[in-house]
Protein backbone atom coordinates (compact mmCIF):
# COMPACT_ATOMS: atom_id res chain seq x y z
CA UNK A 1 0.00 0.00 0.00
CA UNK A 2 2.72 2.50 0.95
CA UNK A 3 4.47 1.96 -2.40
CA UNK A 4 1.25 2.62 -4.32
CA UNK A 5 0.58 5.81 -2.36
CA UNK A 6 4.18 6.97 -2.92
CA UNK A 7 3.73 6.72 -6.71
CA UNK A 8 0.43 8.61 -6.54
CA UNK A 9 2.09 11.33 -4.47
CA UNK A 10 4.90 11.60 -7.01
CA UNK A 11 2.22 12.24 -9.64
CA UNK A 12 0.42 14.92 -7.59
CA UNK A 13 1.89 17.83 -9.63
CA UNK A 14 0.04 16.39 -12.66
CA UNK A 15 -3.25 15.96 -10.78
CA UNK A 16 -5.99 18.54 -10.29
CA UNK A 17 -6.24 20.46 -7.03
CA UNK A 18 -9.05 19.55 -4.63
CA UNK A 19 -11.69 22.06 -3.65
CA UNK A 20 -14.49 22.03 -1.14
CA UNK A 21 -17.67 20.97 -2.92
CA UNK A 22 -20.05 22.05 -0.13
CA UNK A 23 -19.45 25.51 1.40
CA UNK A 24 -20.79 24.23 4.73
CA UNK A 25 -18.69 21.06 4.71
CA UNK A 26 -16.21 20.44 7.50
CA UNK A 27 -14.13 18.78 4.85
CA UNK A 28 -11.03 18.18 6.95
CA UNK A 29 -13.17 16.18 9.38
CA UNK A 30 -14.99 13.58 7.26
CA UNK A 31 -18.15 12.16 8.72
CA UNK A 32 -17.86 8.45 9.45
CA UNK A 33 -20.86 6.20 8.87
CA UNK A 34 -21.13 2.46 9.24
CA UNK A 35 -22.89 1.89 5.91
CA UNK A 36 -23.04 3.78 2.64
CA UNK A 37 -26.83 3.50 2.66
CA UNK A 38 -26.88 6.04 5.51
CA UNK A 39 -25.87 8.92 3.23
CA UNK A 40 -28.60 8.36 0.62
CA UNK A 41 -30.84 11.12 2.06
CA UNK A 42 -27.92 13.56 1.62
CA UNK A 43 -27.51 13.13 -2.15
CA UNK A 44 -29.50 13.14 -5.38
CA UNK A 45 -27.03 11.01 -7.35
CA UNK A 46 -24.05 8.74 -6.85
CA UNK A 47 -21.15 7.91 -9.13
CA UNK A 48 -20.03 4.40 -8.15
CA UNK A 49 -16.53 3.10 -8.77
CA UNK A 50 -16.34 -0.45 -10.07
CA UNK A 51 -13.58 -2.24 -8.17
CA UNK A 52 -13.88 -1.88 -4.41
CA UNK A 53 -17.50 -0.72 -4.57
CA UNK A 54 -19.45 -2.94 -6.97
CA UNK A 55 -17.03 -5.84 -7.18
CA UNK A 56 -13.80 -7.26 -5.83
CA UNK A 57 -12.01 -9.29 -8.44
CA UNK A 58 -14.51 -11.27 -10.47
CA UNK A 59 -17.26 -11.30 -7.86
CA UNK A 60 -19.84 -8.70 -6.82
CA UNK A 61 -19.53 -7.21 -3.35
CA UNK A 62 -21.90 -8.74 -0.81
CA UNK A 63 -24.95 -6.53 -0.46
CA UNK A 64 -24.61 -4.63 -3.74
CA UNK A 65 -28.02 -5.78 -5.01
CA UNK A 66 -29.72 -4.63 -1.81
CA UNK A 67 -27.88 -1.30 -1.84
CA UNK A 68 -28.86 -0.54 -5.43
CA UNK A 69 -32.48 -1.40 -4.67
CA UNK A 70 -32.50 0.95 -1.68
CA UNK A 71 -30.93 3.76 -3.72
CA UNK A 72 -33.67 3.35 -6.31
CA UNK A 73 -36.32 3.32 -3.60
CA UNK A 74 -34.97 6.64 -2.32
CA UNK A 75 -34.90 8.10 -5.85
CA UNK A 76 -31.10 8.45 -5.90
CA UNK A 77 -29.75 8.44 -9.46
CA UNK A 78 -26.86 6.10 -10.19
CA UNK A 79 -23.95 6.04 -12.61
CA UNK A 80 -20.89 3.79 -12.71
CA UNK A 81 -17.58 5.59 -13.23
CA UNK A 82 -14.59 3.30 -13.47
CA UNK A 83 -10.96 3.63 -14.45
CA UNK A 84 -10.90 0.85 -16.99
CA UNK A 85 -9.66 1.13 -20.55
CA UNK A 86 -8.45 -2.28 -21.69
CA UNK A 87 -11.85 -2.86 -23.27
CA UNK A 88 -14.95 -0.78 -23.90
CA UNK A 89 -17.42 0.02 -21.13
CA UNK A 90 -19.86 -2.38 -22.78
CA UNK A 91 -17.70 -5.23 -21.44
CA UNK A 92 -18.10 -3.91 -17.90
CA UNK A 93 -21.83 -3.51 -18.40
CA UNK A 94 -22.08 -7.10 -19.70
CA UNK A 95 -20.41 -8.30 -16.50
CA UNK A 96 -22.95 -6.40 -14.42
CA UNK A 97 -25.75 -7.94 -16.46
CA UNK A 98 -24.39 -11.39 -15.69
CA UNK A 99 -24.55 -10.55 -11.99
CA UNK A 100 -28.12 -9.30 -12.28
CA UNK A 101 -27.29 -5.68 -11.44
CA UNK A 102 -29.98 -3.22 -12.62
CA UNK A 103 -27.81 -0.96 -14.77
CA UNK A 104 -28.49 -0.14 -18.40
CA UNK A 105 -25.62 0.49 -20.79
CA UNK A 106 -25.93 4.29 -20.62
CA UNK A 107 -25.23 4.25 -16.88
CA UNK A 108 -21.74 2.77 -17.22
CA UNK A 109 -18.86 5.12 -18.06
CA UNK A 110 -15.19 4.17 -18.23
CA UNK A 111 -12.00 6.18 -18.53
CA UNK A 112 -11.65 4.78 -22.04
CA UNK A 113 -14.74 6.80 -22.96
CA UNK A 114 -12.93 10.03 -22.10
CA UNK A 115 -10.01 9.10 -24.33
CA UNK A 116 -12.34 8.07 -27.15
CA UNK A 117 -14.04 11.46 -26.93
CA UNK A 118 -10.65 13.10 -27.47
CA UNK A 119 -9.77 11.18 -30.64
CA UNK A 120 -11.59 13.64 -32.91
CA UNK A 121 -9.22 16.36 -31.70
CA UNK A 122 -6.14 14.41 -32.82
CA UNK A 123 -5.03 14.84 -36.42
CA UNK A 124 -5.88 11.88 -38.64
CA UNK A 125 -2.25 11.93 -39.76
CA UNK A 126 -1.08 10.87 -36.29
CA UNK A 127 -0.67 7.11 -35.96
CA UNK A 128 -1.95 6.11 -32.53
CA UNK A 129 -0.41 3.03 -30.94
CA UNK A 130 -2.64 1.10 -28.51
CA UNK A 131 -0.78 -0.61 -25.66
CA UNK A 132 -0.58 -3.21 -24.10
CA UNK A 133 -1.22 -6.65 -25.65
CA UNK A 134 -4.27 -7.71 -23.64
CA UNK A 135 -6.56 -4.89 -24.80
CA UNK A 136 -9.13 -4.10 -27.44
CA UNK A 137 -7.33 -1.61 -29.70
CA UNK A 138 -8.81 1.83 -30.24
CA UNK A 139 -11.24 2.01 -33.15
CA UNK A 140 -9.33 4.48 -35.32
CA UNK A 141 -8.32 4.21 -38.95
CA UNK A 142 -4.60 3.81 -39.41
CA UNK A 143 -3.93 2.94 -35.78
CA UNK A 144 -1.48 0.27 -34.69
CA UNK A 145 -1.68 -2.05 -31.69
CA UNK A 146 0.49 -4.48 -29.80
CA UNK A 147 -2.56 -6.73 -29.55
CA UNK A 148 -2.50 -7.03 -33.35
CA UNK A 149 1.21 -7.77 -33.53
CA UNK A 150 2.03 -4.38 -35.07
CA UNK A 151 5.45 -2.76 -34.76
CA UNK A 152 3.99 -0.15 -32.43
CA UNK A 153 7.20 1.18 -30.94
CA UNK A 154 8.58 2.10 -34.36
CA UNK A 155 5.37 3.19 -36.08
CA UNK A 156 3.29 5.12 -33.54
CA UNK A 157 3.32 8.89 -33.37
CA UNK A 158 1.35 8.81 -30.11
CA UNK A 159 1.04 6.07 -27.51
CA UNK A 160 -2.31 5.33 -25.85
CA UNK A 161 -1.82 3.32 -22.65
CA UNK A 162 -5.05 1.34 -22.28
CA UNK A 163 -4.10 -1.48 -19.93
CA UNK A 164 -1.21 -3.27 -18.28
CA UNK A 165 -2.30 -6.88 -17.82
CA UNK A 166 0.30 -8.12 -20.31
CA UNK A 167 2.86 -5.36 -19.75
CA UNK A 168 6.34 -6.19 -18.49
CA UNK A 169 9.86 -4.84 -18.17
CA UNK A 170 10.77 -5.57 -21.80
CA UNK A 171 7.74 -3.62 -23.01
CA UNK A 172 8.56 -0.77 -20.66
CA UNK A 173 12.13 -0.59 -21.89
CA UNK A 174 10.91 -0.54 -25.50
CA UNK A 175 8.43 2.25 -24.75
CA UNK A 176 11.03 4.38 -23.02
CA UNK A 177 13.50 3.84 -25.86
CA UNK A 178 10.89 4.78 -28.47
CA UNK A 179 9.90 7.97 -26.65
CA UNK A 180 13.52 8.83 -26.01
CA UNK A 181 14.13 8.63 -29.74
CA UNK A 182 10.90 10.05 -31.17
CA UNK A 183 9.48 12.19 -28.34
CA UNK A 184 5.96 10.84 -28.91
CA UNK A 185 3.29 11.98 -26.42
CA UNK A 186 1.78 9.44 -24.03
CA UNK A 187 -1.97 9.32 -23.37
CA UNK A 188 -2.97 7.41 -20.25
CA UNK A 189 -6.54 6.09 -20.37
CA UNK A 190 -6.32 4.45 -16.94
CA UNK A 191 -4.47 6.56 -14.34
CA UNK A 192 -4.69 3.86 -11.65
CA UNK A 193 -1.28 3.06 -10.16
CA UNK A 194 -2.18 -0.24 -8.53
CA UNK A 195 -5.11 -2.48 -7.69
CA UNK A 196 -5.41 -5.08 -4.91
CA UNK A 197 -5.00 -8.60 -6.24
CA UNK A 198 -4.24 -11.93 -4.57
CA UNK A 199 -2.87 -10.38 -1.40
CA UNK A 200 -0.76 -7.78 -3.19
CA UNK A 201 -1.12 -5.09 -5.84
CA UNK A 202 -0.99 -5.20 -9.62
CA UNK A 203 0.95 -2.55 -11.53
CA UNK A 204 -1.54 -0.51 -13.54
CA UNK A 205 -0.92 2.01 -16.38
CA UNK A 206 -0.46 4.90 -13.95
CA UNK A 207 2.52 3.12 -12.41
CA UNK A 208 4.19 2.49 -15.76
CA UNK A 209 3.40 6.03 -16.89
CA UNK A 210 5.10 7.44 -13.79
CA UNK A 211 8.20 5.44 -14.63
CA UNK A 212 8.09 6.64 -18.23
CA UNK A 213 7.85 10.26 -17.12
CA UNK A 214 10.83 9.83 -14.81
CA UNK A 215 12.91 8.12 -17.51
CA UNK A 216 12.03 10.32 -20.49
CA UNK A 217 10.24 13.49 -19.40
CA UNK A 218 7.46 12.53 -21.82
CA UNK A 219 4.48 14.84 -22.36
CA UNK A 220 1.41 13.12 -20.91
CA UNK A 221 -2.36 13.52 -21.13
CA UNK A 222 -4.62 11.77 -18.63
CA UNK A 223 -8.21 10.66 -19.26
CA UNK A 224 -9.57 8.93 -16.17
CA UNK A 225 -10.09 9.74 -12.52
CA UNK A 226 -8.91 12.07 -10.95
CA UNK A 227 -8.83 14.21 -14.08
CA UNK A 228 -11.71 16.53 -14.90
CA UNK A 229 -12.71 15.27 -18.35
CA UNK A 230 -14.11 11.96 -17.13
CA UNK A 231 -16.16 13.60 -14.36
CA UNK A 232 -17.63 16.16 -16.74
CA UNK A 233 -18.46 13.42 -19.25
CA UNK A 234 -20.18 11.31 -16.58
CA UNK A 235 -22.08 14.32 -15.24
CA UNK A 236 -23.34 15.13 -18.73
CA UNK A 237 -24.44 11.53 -19.25
CA UNK A 238 -26.15 11.53 -15.84
CA UNK A 239 -28.28 14.52 -16.80
CA UNK A 240 -28.98 13.12 -20.25
CA UNK A 241 -30.00 9.69 -18.95
CA UNK A 242 -32.27 10.99 -16.19
CA UNK A 243 -33.44 13.95 -18.30
CA UNK A 244 -33.05 16.46 -15.49
CA UNK A 245 -30.52 18.81 -13.97
CA UNK A 246 -28.42 18.02 -10.90
CA UNK A 247 -26.54 20.27 -8.49
CA UNK A 248 -22.93 19.18 -8.19
CA UNK A 249 -22.91 19.45 -4.40
CA UNK A 250 -25.76 16.91 -4.32
CA UNK A 251 -23.78 14.35 -6.34
CA UNK A 252 -21.17 12.15 -4.65
CA UNK A 253 -18.44 9.91 -5.99
CA UNK A 254 -18.10 6.61 -4.11
CA UNK A 255 -14.74 4.87 -4.34
CA UNK A 256 -11.86 3.20 -2.54
CA UNK A 257 -9.00 5.43 -3.75
CA UNK A 258 -8.04 8.80 -2.31
CA UNK A 259 -5.99 9.88 -5.32
CA UNK A 260 -8.48 8.96 -8.05
CA UNK A 261 -12.02 8.87 -6.65
CA UNK A 262 -11.85 11.36 -3.78
CA UNK A 263 -9.40 13.89 -5.20
CA UNK A 264 -11.09 13.82 -8.59
CA UNK A 265 -14.54 14.34 -7.14
CA UNK A 266 -13.38 17.29 -5.07
CA UNK A 267 -11.66 18.92 -8.04
CA UNK A 268 -14.84 18.48 -10.10
CA UNK A 269 -17.00 20.13 -7.45
CA UNK A 270 -18.65 16.91 -6.31
CA UNK A 271 -18.92 15.37 -2.87
CA UNK A 272 -17.23 12.06 -2.11
CA UNK A 273 -17.41 8.91 -0.04
CA UNK A 274 -14.38 6.77 0.76
CA UNK A 275 -15.56 3.16 1.01
CA UNK A 276 -12.99 1.26 3.05
CA UNK A 277 -14.28 -2.28 3.47
CA UNK A 278 -13.48 -3.88 0.12
CA UNK A 279 -10.67 -2.23 -1.84
CA UNK A 280 -7.41 -0.39 -1.19
CA UNK A 281 -8.07 0.14 2.52
CA UNK A 282 -9.69 -3.19 3.31
CA UNK A 283 -6.81 -3.95 5.73
CA UNK A 284 -7.01 -0.52 7.40
CA UNK A 285 -4.91 2.62 7.26
CA UNK A 286 -7.43 4.97 5.65
CA UNK A 287 -7.33 7.59 8.40
CA UNK A 288 -3.55 7.78 8.40
CA UNK A 289 -3.38 8.12 4.62
CA UNK A 290 -6.04 10.82 4.59
CA UNK A 291 -3.95 12.93 6.95
CA UNK A 292 -0.69 12.12 5.17
CA UNK A 293 -2.00 13.05 1.71
CA UNK A 294 -4.40 15.80 2.79
CA UNK A 295 -7.13 14.41 0.55
CA UNK A 296 -10.39 14.54 2.46
CA UNK A 297 -13.66 12.79 1.59
CA UNK A 298 -16.98 14.14 2.82
CA UNK A 299 -17.83 10.76 4.29
CA UNK A 300 -16.06 7.54 5.19
CA UNK A 301 -18.17 4.37 5.06
CA UNK A 302 -17.02 0.90 6.01
CA UNK A 303 -19.52 -1.11 3.97
CA UNK A 304 -22.48 -0.73 1.66
Model segments located where?
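Asp-based, Mg2+/Mn2+-dependent phosphohydrolase catalytic module
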Residues: 1-59, 65-74, 87-109, 116, ...
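Conserved phosphate/oxyanion-binding catalytic-loop motifs
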Residues: 84
Amino acid sequence: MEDVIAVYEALRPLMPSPMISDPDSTITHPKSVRQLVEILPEVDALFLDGFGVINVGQDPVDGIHEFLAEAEAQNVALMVLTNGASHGAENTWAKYQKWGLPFVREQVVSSRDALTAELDNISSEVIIGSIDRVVTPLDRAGGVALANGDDVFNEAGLFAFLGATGWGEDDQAALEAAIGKGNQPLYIANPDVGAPFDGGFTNEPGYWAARTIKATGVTTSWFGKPHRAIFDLTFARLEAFYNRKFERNRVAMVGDSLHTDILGASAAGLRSVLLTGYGLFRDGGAGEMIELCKIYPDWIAATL
